[in-house]
């Protein structure tokens, strides 16, 4: 059985990501000064008595990260603070973000922008994959509260707007899961705590403005966009959605200006014969692809 991952709250040190670094973009670490690292002399080559193995003992200069803004967590050269509200939005709803650990190391993530727009006592980010009542008493208490909702689409989910009209208790807290769709599914179904709150979903035809990251379908929204729509409904204030989307629009604009490409949804690519990868042989995955091609909600 896979060992359980320890959950953390936002701000705690994260373990270094495994694997090689991705190609540099305006949001990634700058290259080490001084050009490319020295290459080892091939075995048997003349003119250098130092063996290739000896290079392992040489000191390594680590690339320095560019200075980041303390508020929006972006590099200072592309700081998004001018697009954030001057003061945090005054809301009564408490937002809990359950973030998959892999999202914490992503450069183009939306949760830091969302947190920068809200009061610290109204936005709590918990990082992890497995949560239990024994290990997180606070989260368990929140999940058992009758005023707590969890935003996750599915057959058992009620449309948020319809729920607040019929519910005798007005929601005070809403939980969102931050990660890829497969990561979010894993967190939702493998944590019994998240079955306790009332499950709701958004009924919207709005297309995502987070165009620099591929989504499964044209109707999938980023975590920030989901929070913007949900909070505007719960707070009965459409200006909240506009305010929260402003830094996301600026983020995408900056990236496109620096060479990023618009990422079309997997659904669009499949339906138009543009999907670059071969179709999977696994029957379950193949069935998902067919549903996407036919615009069937999965």
Curated annotation (Swiss-Prot):
The modification N-acetylmethionine is found at residue 1. A motif (DXTW) lies at residues 178-181. Residues 34-45 have a biased composition (Low complexity). SMART domains: DTW. It is found in: Nucleus; Cytoplasm. The keyword Protein transport does not apply. One of its GO terms (biological process) is tRNA modification. The gene is Dtwd2. This is tRNA-uridine aminocarboxypropyltransferase 2.
């Amino acid at each position: 059985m896979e060992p359980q991952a320890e959950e953390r709250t936002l701000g705690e040190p994260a373990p270094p990501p495994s694997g090689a670094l991705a190609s540099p973009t305006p949001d990634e670490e700058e290259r080490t000064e001084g050009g490319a690292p020295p290459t080892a002399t091939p075995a048997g080559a003349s003119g250098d008595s130092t063996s290739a193995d000896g290079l392992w003992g040489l000191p390594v200069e680590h690339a320095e990260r560019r200075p980041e803004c303390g508020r929006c967590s972006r590099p200072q050269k592309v700081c998004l603070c001018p697009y954030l509200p001057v003061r945090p939005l005054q809301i009564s709803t408490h937002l809990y973000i359950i973030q998959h650990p892999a999202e914490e190391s992503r450069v183009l993530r939306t949760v830091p922008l969302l947190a920068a727009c809200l009061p610290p006592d109204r936005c709590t980010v918990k990082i992890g994959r497995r949560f239990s009542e024994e290990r997180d008493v606070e989260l368990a208490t929140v999940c058992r509260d009758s005023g707590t909702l969890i935003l996750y689409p599915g057959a058992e989910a009620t449309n948020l707007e319809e729920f607040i009209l019929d519910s005798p208790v007005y929601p005070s807290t809403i939980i969102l899961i931050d990660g890829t769709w497969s990561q979010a599914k894993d967190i939702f179904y493998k944590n019994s705590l998240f079955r306790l709150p009332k499950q709701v979903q958004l009924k919207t035809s709005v297309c995502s403005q987070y165009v620099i990251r591929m989504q499964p379908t044209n109707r999938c929204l980023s975590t920030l966009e989901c929070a913007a729509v949900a909070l505007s409904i719960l707070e009965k204030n459409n200006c909240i959605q506009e305010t929260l989307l402003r830094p996301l629009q600026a983020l995408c604009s900056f990236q496109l200006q620096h060479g990023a490409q618009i990422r079309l949804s997997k659904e669009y690519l499949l339906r138009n014969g543009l999907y670059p990868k071969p179709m999977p042989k696994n029957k379950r995955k193949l069935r998902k692809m067919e549903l996407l091609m036919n615009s069937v909600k999965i």
